Amino acid sequence: MYNTLISVQQLKDLQTSGKAFMVFDCTGDLMKPEMADTLFATVRIQGAHQAHLDRNLSTHGSSAVNGGRHPLPSREEVATWLGSLGFENQMQAVVYDRNGANYCGRMWWMMKWLGHDAVAVLNGGLQAWEAS
C-alpha cells in the first residue's frame, strides 16, 4: 500500500500486478477552468479518471462544508462520486496533475479526510510519467 508518494516505476508495477487500483488526473487551471477538460482529453495516464476541481473536488451548493472560492463538498458527495466510478475502499488510489502537485494534493487530502489511507501522489506528476 502506498500512502504518500508513488514513483513512476511503482505505478507501472501496480498496473501489471492484478491489484485493484484507480488513477485520478487532478489537472486544473484557476484562470481557465475549461482547460482541465481539454488537457484531460489530450493526454493522461491510460485508464485515469478526471478529478475536476470545480465538479468533483469542490461544491457550490448549500452542502458546502466551508466557504471560499472552492468550498469542500460533503464527505457524502465525495463518496458518492467515487462510488459512481467504481472506486472501493480496498483499492489503491493514485493522484497526479500537471501543476507541481497542486490539485492532486487536495484530492489526496480529501481521500484521507474520508478515511482512505491507500492514496498516493505520483512523484513528479504527469511530466515524470511522460518522461519515463
Model-derived regions: residue spans:
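Cytosolic catalytic domains that perform sulfur/thiol-centered chemistry
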Residues: 1-132
